[in-house]
Amino acid sequence: MKSEIDAGGRGFTNARHCRLAALLLVAVFTQACGQHAATQDPPKAKAAAPSQLPNDTARFLAGLKGRPDGPYSKLEETAPWQKYAKDFDGIWAGIENGQFKKVDEFQQRELAGTKTNSSFVFYPLSGPDVLYANRFFPNAKGFVFAGLEPVGNLRPPSSYTPETMDRETRHWRLGVSSIIERSFFVTSEMDHQFRGEVFDGLLPMILLLLSRSGHTIVDVQYHKLTDDGKLEPEDPGTPPKKHQSVEVQFRRGEDPTVRTVYYFSRDLAAGFEKNPAFARFLTSLGTPDTLVKSGSFLLHWQMCNALRKYILENSNMVLQDDTGVPYAYFTKGGWDIRLFG
């Protein structure tokens, strides 16, 4: 049985299929049959031993004090960083008691009982939105994000100075303001904020948001995709602007479980079909739960036919708002639908 969740208040079921779909803020779909999707761990490219630097950097960007002897300890003593940290503490407390509390209540009420046995969460057109992906799918161990924005790089600690911290922290506030104030990233803002104005890509913001939301960064590795959809370590010396994908491993609070989010900088329109390596990688992971949130209605367009087809044919559940897959595809496809809003 397919299932879809939508936040608009409608729903449907077809016992011929064992799929789940959900439309977020418009509808939710859940799996209702006994057959389980095959699961497997995401393939891992061989990598060097993890370092503490990614977690140090994540905490620094998030306004959270790091190790006393860490590489950012002197910068954390500057007045601009301390003001940024204090302001962020207050803002975050408000979010936790406001919009995040509502999301958590929705997740517990509408999604917690949905068992899809999916291998991972697929979040196309995601930007760096690890916040809501983790909130809606708190038990997921693997996430695959994708979009046009560049991967980005982690600047070395030596590139920051006390003299530049006022400017740096103002930029960080700018970068995070959209997800905090609106609950989503605006495409037009990301186009310049994550192409040099704030960061040179999404990785720093992904780390910032993971750290602020109670996660520890275990490791960060850059990868490239082979034509047959396998991950390989990126060639040494690859310029930051040429990064194809990044893998971030993280833990939540005291939970020892290591979770993974991949971000792929790729064309998901015509490129999804013309360059099938990414689709092959997704297929190698098994079947996903799919999240589409603030997707600019791109999945309504003909140019995204291949991506939409992948979502409909492979997802066990789709959680989306009305910017995702057009509603008619679910009514015609025999999905179980729950709508909200």
Show which residues each predicted segment covers:
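Bacterial N-terminal signal peptides that target proteins for export
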Residues: 4-21
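Sec-dependent N-terminal signal peptides
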Residues: 20-28
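C-terminal motif of bacterial Sec signal peptides marking the signal peptidase cleavage site
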Residues: 31-32
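Cleaved targeting-peptide boundary
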Residues: 35-42
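Non-globular targeting/processing and membrane-anchoring segments
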Residues: 42-174, 263-341
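Short, thiol/selenol-centered motifs that function as redox-active sites or metal-ligating centers
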Residues: 126-137, 144-145, 182-204
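Mature extracytoplasmic/lumenal regions of exported proteins
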Residues: 178-200, 211-215, 219-293
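Sequence context surrounding c-type heme c attachment/ligation sites in exported
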Residues: 207
